[in-house]
């Protein structure tokens, strides 16, 4: 695929625009401050966008009293088309900001690309903060396949990283691994999926599905967390022909082995009532001109508090 750089015209300078930008930064800081849990954050989640949300939501199902923050590093989206040094730099920069701001008890990397490239460096640089990574569920796929043909739907960087090849060699040596990098599908999930019609969603996933059907894969690993959002669409179209697997259960279980938040004690005034689950806050990175509306809508649908742009 050829990558073409497109120069964007410089916006006309307007004095009022600077005042609006400054006001927006102040408002974002107010939002950020108001959404920081009063108690210590149990888990911080990081992805380049919305891919890690299914992991956060699944953790909240199992541990509703967990204090969580989620940061979508939209400033650096997508990670999957970058080279390894740039991914490490971006992930470490984001993690440093999150740790300084929220001081999480544990960190969940809700991104396969970050995990196979930068997890070791994150653990080294920010020790003793524990990091839980997300890697392609090749081991599980190998245990489920009937014909020995496993598909891997992921980003280019995840597919090309030696760590992924090591997983395949260790757990699926007797299987054929059929890989497909699909940056267009990642972009669709991030920027179009949540407002798309059913027909548009099916059209978007069809090329990937047809690819794996053509190669007779009976089990496909969703090796990019963004693809968990489209799993129901893939399952509907594939029927019994393909089983789709991911690492969500294993990642969440590991996170909860490290930190197991307990339900808060009921106050004396409401001792008979059950404490309410802790809300989770969602932040993005980027510039003041980024379109925040889709993320606000997604938070409303997911029961998350929108915190705005993380400074």
Report residues per predicted region.
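Non-catalytic structural scaffold of enzyme domains
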Residues: 1-8, 24-25, 29-311
